[in-house]
């Protein structure tokens, strides 16, 4: 072979190697990015409609499944009974986008996850139609239904606008996650572009928006529920239930002439910190905040997870305490006002951490992933994040919260003691004439469940609404469902069980405490949003029940 031919052969060989390397790059390494590119999204979705997508279940209840449509020769996504009750969790799967668990677990549900590689190879050689895996959630349907029914019943006048989250303190498993108003994801799964677009436009135009997940993606001023965080910081500094405090109706913010008042500008509670906590008096908390440095206050908030997101599989926004430039801002923040803004998820984590003797567990929504043959691909394991507070402080807080439940002004219809804190947060530029955000966080000592409720409005809610009479009944309904007690307006669940249902031991809800007591909205034009609406910096009152 002469020199010229040899050069041509070498050059051709190099080109072949480059071609193979480029092919490997495009087909293997770069493939996921190309597949998920917005311009390829609709084409990828159409391909997925050609295979059977996996089920989403909760304790055996089928929330989402795929049915073969003879007319279109494609698999149609079908959502189960009360789909609007579940859509803040499941999200939707459409031609243009996905959200919620449908997005977060898409690789498993579509069968594209590496954990299902063996199944894909078998399908290739056997000629079996490719199928996706299944996702089992930690949600308990009876608790979810209790939360949803309570939100729809409200104060007797109609549906409320708000969110609910219940957590198992010992594991972090999310037992209920409800948001109202909500939407039916079924029309978004239509094969008709026109139908999907029309429904999407209707949802976007609705007010209050059903697309906001108020349980996880709308941080709002928590009012007096935040006093449990402030109290944790104060207890660390030596304050206790018998510490003397003023019951004066107002105080002056440090280094200012600005007054801060109790709810209604009234004398509040007795002369001890324990009674000030029970009656949710603002003045003692503002005065005692002088004992704390800004960093100590921030550290306590951070230890409870404020500022974090948890990647649970639905759209989330981080809670915040905002900037605290001086002692006056610290006093306002200490009562859950100014720029403090929490989600029900974060407030539920705070309650669960106290119930778990001060240990914060990572919240999770996915209990297990399985292949079509029910072989387990993934099983959730509880994960301890940190010790937020000492066991001693947790027990002190529990006692204070049990007393607060007794003085809150709402009726405890449970047959066991409840540890709780209510909140009624003013907000906006005209806070005195705005409907307050009402809150309730609670847990049942000796039982492995904690709950947080936020109500921002709805039928029958007005400027005089308070936490115990609006949010409190919703939270207690969820706790009653957790304990197996009858709940108002509830019905016996009649959901169809998955034929593949097999109970698992992982994150199984129990009403007995263990010894240690331990959204995502993606795609082109995706539906869904999250907002943060913090309290007005000049708001200096915060109200609670019985004040």
Task: State where each predicted segment sits.
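Residue-level detector of intrinsically disordered, flexible termini
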Residues: 149, 407, 504-506, 531
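Beta-lactam-recognizing serine transpeptidase/beta-lactamase-like catalytic domain environment
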Residues: 174-224, 229-457, 467, 513, ...
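Ser/Thr-rich, Proline-interspersed low-complexity disordered segments
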Residues: 496, 500-510, 514
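Periplasmic/cell-envelope proteins involved in peptidoglycan metabolism and beta-lactam response
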Residues: 1-195, 219-221, 295-303, 461-496, ...
